[in-house]
């Protein structure tokens, strides 16, 4: 009997621990650096959400390619971008920033993820309005504690930038449902048009549908969650295991 009790306790502990370890919601954002809709979504939906109460429950992946295309000839890669050559350069800057931005060990409040988010948000806010046609990379780096702008710029102007942008393109082309609009948002690496459309107007509410309990307080404002909470899952598991435990004696 004691062995059975120990087995039940161990199983419940493993199941609950697994649920907690998978708490972060994976979100992939496929976008273009000079796309107005991408800019609106990132600056008005993504940035406020992940810089607020939801920052610890999401895992963001940015894929800066969108409807661009590329052709490879030998070692050369030629890109054609939805909003012209400036967007190709912007996409490369984004790809290089995602690759190269590092946390500052002397400023622990600036994590790699938060620095990347701040930098991308700044670039997207600038949109197509560059004073004197100067791309705002250096300004956004300076304003957001990015200490290695020169590395990012060198990457964007070199073969490395082309390689990283091609990887973003390959990732975009591997989507099960071909990308037809920008931005496109995936939750848990799965595309669902209804979820995508809802996320673009209410990202916080959509994220909360995927967050296990205990949820951040902001989720209390969004009561349409369709995903069972961790507490609900634990209760169901406890009931099922309890039934199994009782029946094992008969």
Swiss-Prot record:
Keyword Disulfide bond: no
Positions of glycan attachment: 157
Annotated signal sequence range: 1-21
Disulphide bond pairs: none
Major subcellular site: secreted
Family matches, as InterPro entries: Interferon-induced_GILT (IPR004911)
Keyword Ubl conjugation carried by entry: yes
Subcellular location: Secreted
Gene3D superfamilies associated with the record: Glutaredoxin
PTM description: Conjugated to URM1, a ubiquitin-like protein.
Keyword line: Glycoprotein, Immunity, Secreted, Signal, Ubl conjugation
Expression triggers: Up-regulated following injection with the Gram-negative bacterium E.coli. Up-regulation increases between 1 and 6 hours after the injection, then expression remains at a relatively steady level until 72 hours when it is strongly up-regulated.
A cellular-component GO term for this protein: extracellular region
GO biological process: one example: immune system process
Pfam families xref list: GILT (PF03227)
Null mutant phenotype: RNAi-mediated knockdown in the fat body or hemocyte of flies infected with the Gram-negative bacterium E.coli results in an increase in bacterial load 24 hours after infection.
Function: Involved in the immune response to bacterial infection.
Family: Belongs to the GILT family.
Stated name of the protein: GILT-like protein 1
Originating species: Drosophila melanogaster
Lineage: Eukaryota, Metazoa, Ecdysozoa, Arthropoda, Hexapoda
Name of the gene encoding the protein in the UniProt record: GILT1
């Amino acid at each position: 009997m004691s062995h059975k009790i120990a087995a039940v306790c161990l199983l419940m502990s493993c199941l609950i621990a697994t649920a907690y370890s998978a708490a972060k919601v994976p979100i992939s954002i496929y976008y273009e650096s000079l796309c107005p809709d991408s800019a609106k979504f990132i600056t008005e939906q993504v940035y406020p959400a992940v810089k607020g109460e939801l920052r610890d429950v999401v895992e963001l992946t940015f894929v800066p390619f969108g409807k661009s295309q590329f052709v490879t000839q030998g070692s050369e890669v030629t890109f054609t971008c939805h909003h012209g050559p400036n967007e190709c350069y912007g996409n490369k800057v984004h790809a290089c920033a995602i690759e190269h931005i590092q946390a500052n060990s002397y400023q622990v409040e600036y994590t790699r993820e938060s620095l990347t988010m701040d930098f991308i948000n700044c670039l997207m806010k600038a949109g197509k309005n560059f004073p004197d046609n100067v791309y705002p990379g250096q300004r956004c780096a300076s304003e957001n504690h990015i200490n290695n702008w020169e590395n990012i710029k060198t990457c964007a102007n070199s073969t490395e930038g082309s390689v990283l942008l091609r990887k973003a393109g390959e990732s975009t082309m591997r989507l099960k449902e071909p990308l037809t609009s920008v931005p496109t948002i995936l939750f848990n690496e799965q595309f669902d048009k209804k979820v995508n459309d809802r996320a673009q107007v209410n990202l916080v509410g959509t994220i909360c549908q995927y967050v296990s309990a205990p949820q951040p307080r902001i989720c209390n404002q969004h009561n349409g969650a369709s995903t069972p909470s961790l507490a609900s899952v634990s209760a169901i598991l406890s009931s099922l295991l309890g039934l199994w435990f009782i029946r094992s004696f008969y």
